[in-house]
Amino acid sequence: MTDNLLKGFQEYRASVYEGENPIMDQLIKEGQNPDYFIISCIDSRANPGTIFKPAPGTFFAHKAMGAIVRPYNQGTALAAALHFAITYNKVKTIIVM
């Protein structure tokens, strides 16, 4: 792992995950229930976490080549992720970037 990625992970762990972050504590204790599911391209320049600057637990994210959503077909990773998000977490909005 390159030094800058490792440093970023260590800062995240110290400040967000292990720090005194009430949002993270709440998500750990009560579970996650994001309102959004974002489907985006695998393009490294278009990262939803960077673009929207969300708080932890704001959305689920799925990356697909070209942000292409194929017809529903059980057994695909996107179908499984959408099923989980909608059925168990009651996601209200799906965004395709």
Task: Give residue spans per PLM region.
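Short, conserved "active-site rim" segments that organize catalytic pockets and cofactor/ligand binding
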Residues: M1-T76
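Alpha-helix C-terminal capping segments
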Residues: K53, F84-K90
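A short mixed-secondary-structure module that forms the rim of ligand-binding clefts
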Residues: Y72-I86
